[in-house]
């Protein structure tokens, strides 16, 4: 089916397969977490909402993230760590550091990234302890954190690791090189993208990382991803166009607002919001006004609501923010975390 997401060679993203719908919906990177399957729209949904003051939701959002850091589900813990980093919740970093001892490697991976993303210098000592971790991906995340904390020598470790035969390691390294802003790694990323032995997850992550580094030569590759018959590949291309951020990339994103799959439209709206363009607002509102989650199964509804919340966080318009109170009280933990992130992001913009 056109809207069925392809699972390519254990395709992954910044939240392992067991994460189900991680908040980033990254088609690339972390722990080979993949883009989940996309379903077509239904009818029925969340209904009308009144205008709200985003400040009224802030404490509720903070508590959701705080509680989620201690959740029994490792996917939820990972999602919460990501939100801490994405929204700059520096007060929660000590709790994130405790998760360096988590039994699940993806949680430790995300915790190391958070230290680097927030450039939390007080965490350097504990990050170095992760070099003893049994998981190679966690060690690489520790290298990323140290680079962000000023130890550029660890870049060389990451550059060498992209040649790994382990496709998950290779994809994660591509992701980390992009996050490091290492333009000297462009040649390596092109190699990884073009190598015949690279899995799809490596190819798509390398493409996104090249876009993150601002190399507009990647545009034709990203455009072909937008033309894919597979919705998950289109979503990956959309994320990469958002990372590239050129005028041509923005125009490409605008064209994806007409996609027949709701998740693809939401991804395009979110990435336009990333570029401070609110053109996609009607596509997000349509989830509520046309009740697009009605008729979906539980997982499909959760997925659409997570992506809706993510788009709201990027766009942060009053007409969208008013729907956050319902999303933040959704029965799904993943939706509540996504809504909490949207609240915190919206507050930063308003």
Ranges and model annotations:
Residues 37, 57-68, 89-101, 120-132, ...:
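Amphipathic alpha-helical scaffolding segments comprising HEAT/armadillo-like alpha-solenoid repeats
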Residues 72-73, 103-104, 134-135, 165-166, ...:
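Short inter-helical turns and helix N-cap capping residues of alpha-solenoid HEAT/ARM repeat scaffolds
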Residues 165-240:
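Solenoidal tandem-repeat scaffolds enriched in leucines and small polar residues
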């Amino acid at each position: 089916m056109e809207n069925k997401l392809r699972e390519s060679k254990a395709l992954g993203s910044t939240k392992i397969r067991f994460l189900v719908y991680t908040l980033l919906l990254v088609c690339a990177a972390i722990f080979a977490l993949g883009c989940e399957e996309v379903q077509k729209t239904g009818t029925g949904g969340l209904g009308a909402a009144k205008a709200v003051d985003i400040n009224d939701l802030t404490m509720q959002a903070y508590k959701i993230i705080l509680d989620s850091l201690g959740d029994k589900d490792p996917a939820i813990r990972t999602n919460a760590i990501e939100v801490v980093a994405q929204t700059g919740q520096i007060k929660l970093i000590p709790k994130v550091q405790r998760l360096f001892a988590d039994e699940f490697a993806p949680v430790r991976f995300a915790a190391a990234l958070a230290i680097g993303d927030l450039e939390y210098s007080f965490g350097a000592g504990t990050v170095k302890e992760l070099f003893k971790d049994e998981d190679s991906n966690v060690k690489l995340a520790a290298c990323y954190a140290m680079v962000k904390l000023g130890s550029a020598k660890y870049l060389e470790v990451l550059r060498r690791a992209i040649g790994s035969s382990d496709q998950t390691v290779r994809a994660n390294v591509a992701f980390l090189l992009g996050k490091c802003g290492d333009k000297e790694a462009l040649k390596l990323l092109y190699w990884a993208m073009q190598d015949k032995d690279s899995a799809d997850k490596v190819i798509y992550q390398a493409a996104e990382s090249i876009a993150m580094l601002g190399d507009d030569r990647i545009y034709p590759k990203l455009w072909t991803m937008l033309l894919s018959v597979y919705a998950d590949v289109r979503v990956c291309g959309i994320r990469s166009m958002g990372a590239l951020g050129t005028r041509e990339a923005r125009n490409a994103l605008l064209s994806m607002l007409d996609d027949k799959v709701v998740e693809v439209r939401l991804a395009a709206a979110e990435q336009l919001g990333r570029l401070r363009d609110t053109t996609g607002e009607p596509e997000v509102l349509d989830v509520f006004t046309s009740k697009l989650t009605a008729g979906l199964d539980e997982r499909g509804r959760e997925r659409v609501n997570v992506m809706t919340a993510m788009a709201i966080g990027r766009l942060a318009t009053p007409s969208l923010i008013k729907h956050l109170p319902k999303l933040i009280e959704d029965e799904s933990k993943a939706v509540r975390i996504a809504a909490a992130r949207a609240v915190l992001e919206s507050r930063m913009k308003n």
